[in-house]
């Protein structure tokens, strides 16, 4: 039996390792050409110390206190030369990917679907046999090369990978390089290059209630996360607040409704900032955060949106006098 171990490097690159039962993560990594920091291999030096974000694993008792203290082990630190995965895991590696003789993976795919969801948003799906090998954590992104140019644009996955196909939500920008291609030139079958996955914004192990805050096409990583949660189930409540500027920016509402039907503890709301909106809930995301959703601080908050939204939410939470258990955020600025 094998388990997937995601290695999240400090430069944002993520690579996946297949670890066999009883095999140390370090041995599995080196077997697959990923040279994690390592020295003694005996649990004596601490050179391979990483942080386990999630997953079940064993460390054995053969390492020494100087290499990994009891307090560090309780916090989630591991020695990869001793760590044996007992489920899929995620570890943070305190080194850049190039130092570990690896880099972001590259793929070729073809457009399988492209459609304009509204005057401001485009849905893009790409597919290829090689994408069956693409593994990523829900919430991460890739760099897509704009066909016919040497320019790339970063987009979060809006779906999980299924049968070699992945999807994205893309904001349409007047005169934008990718926007112009997708609206005027793109057709099914066109070739697309991508590299990744990248990013430290991804779904962690769910240990408490979640509050998900999306701004505009910042909804994309959350639909991928919700797809994963729908697959694996969970007992903790989660609420999504989706904020946009104009009515036409509201997209994928049918998908959110479908998730609400599939995930027992999931609820969502949406709001539109424009005072001219016909949508029932007007205003900003912070106006629709309820005290019960903050759960006295026993909550993990995920936020993806433009920088002003991230700052506004941060200020709001501070004003409530609450320190959430975890606050993960991804700022994005649309690129032309």
From Swiss-Prot:
Enzyme Commission designation: 1.18.1.3
Region (Ferredoxin-reductase) residue spans: 99-336
Residue stretches making up the FAD-binding FR-type domain: 104-204
First-level EC class: oxidoreductase
Pfam family of the protein (one): Fer2
Catalytic activity: 2 reduced [2Fe-2S]-[ferredoxin] + NAD(+) + H(+) = 2 oxidized [2Fe-2S]-[ferredoxin] + NADH
GO molecular function, one term: 2 iron, 2 sulfur cluster binding
UniProt: [2Fe-2S] cluster binding residues: 40, 45, 48, 81
InterPro entries with a match to the protein in the record: 2Fe-2S_ferredoxin-like_sf, 2Fe-2S_ferredoxin-type, 2Fe2S_fd_BS, BenC-like_FAD_NAD-bd, Beta-grasp_dom_sf, Cbr1-like_FAD-bd_dom, FAD-bd_FR_type, Flavoprot_Pyr_Nucl_cyt_Rdtase
Database matches in CDD domains: BenDO_FAD_NAD, fer2
This protein's UniProt keywords: 2Fe-2S, Aromatic hydrocarbons catabolism, FAD, Flavoprotein, Iron, Iron-sulfur, Metal-binding, NAD, Oxidoreductase, Plasmid
Stretches that traverse the bilayer: none
Protein's GO biological process: catabolic process
Domain 2Fe-2S ferredoxin-type: 3-97
Bound cofactor: record note: Binds 1 [2Fe-2S] cluster per subunit.
PROSITE patterns according to UniProt: 2FE2S_FER_1, 2FE2S_FER_2, FAD_FR
Cofactor(s) the protein requires to work: FAD; [2Fe-2S] cluster
Function: Electron transfer component of toluate 1,2-dioxygenase system.
Family statement drawn from the similarity comment of this UniProt entry: Belongs to the bacterial ring-hydroxylating dioxygenase ferredoxin reductase family.
Assembly behavior: This dioxygenase system consists of three proteins: the two subunits of the hydroxylase component (XylX and XylY), and an electron transfer component (XylZ).
Name by which UniProt lists this protein: Toluate 1,2-dioxygenase electron transfer component
Protein's organism: Pseudomonas putida (Arthrobacter siderocapsulatus)
Gene behind this protein: xylZ
């Amino acid at each position: 039996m094998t388990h997937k171990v995601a290695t999240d490097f400090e430069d944002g690159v993520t690579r996946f390792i297949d670890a066999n039962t009883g095999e140390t993560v370090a041995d599995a990594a080196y077997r697959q050409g990923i040279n994690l920091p390592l020295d003694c291999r005996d649990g004596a030096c601490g050179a391979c110390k990483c942080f386990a974000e999630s997953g079940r694993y064993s460390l054995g008792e053969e390492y020494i206190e100087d290499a990994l203290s009891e307090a560090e082990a309780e916090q989630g630190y591991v020695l990869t030369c001793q760590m044996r995965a007992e489920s899929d895991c995620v570890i943070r590696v305190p080194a850049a990917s190039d130092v570990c003789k690896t880099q972001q993976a590259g793929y070729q795919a073809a457009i399988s679907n492209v459609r304009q969801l509204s005057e401001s948003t485009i849905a893009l799906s790409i597919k290829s046999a090689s994408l069956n090998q693409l593994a990523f954590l829900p919430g991460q992104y890739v760099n897509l090369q704009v066909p016919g140019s040497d320019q790339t644009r970063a987009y979060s996955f809006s779906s999980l990978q299924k049968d070699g196909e992945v999807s994205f939500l893309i904001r349409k920008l007047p005169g934008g390089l990718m926007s112009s291609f997708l609206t005027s030139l793109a057709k099914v079958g066109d070739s697309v290059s991508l590299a990744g996955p990248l990013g430290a914004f991804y779904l962690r192990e769910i240990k408490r209630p979640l509050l998900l805050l999306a701004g505009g096409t910042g909804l994309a990583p959350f639909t991928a996360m919700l797809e994963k949660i729908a697959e694996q189930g969970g007992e903790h409540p989660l609420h999504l607040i989706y904020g946009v500027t104009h009515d036409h920016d509201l997209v994928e509402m049918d998908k959110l409704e479908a998730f609400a039907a599939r995930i027992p503890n999931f609820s969502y709301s949406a709001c539109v900032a424009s005072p001219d909106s016909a949508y029932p809930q007007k205003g900003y995301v912070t106006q629709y955060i309820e005290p019960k959703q903050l759960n006295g601080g026993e909550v993990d908050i995920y936020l993806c949106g433009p920088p002003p939204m991230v700052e506004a939410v941060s200020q709001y939470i501070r004003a409530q006098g609450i320190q959430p258990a975890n606050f993960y955020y991804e700022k994005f600025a649309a690129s032309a």
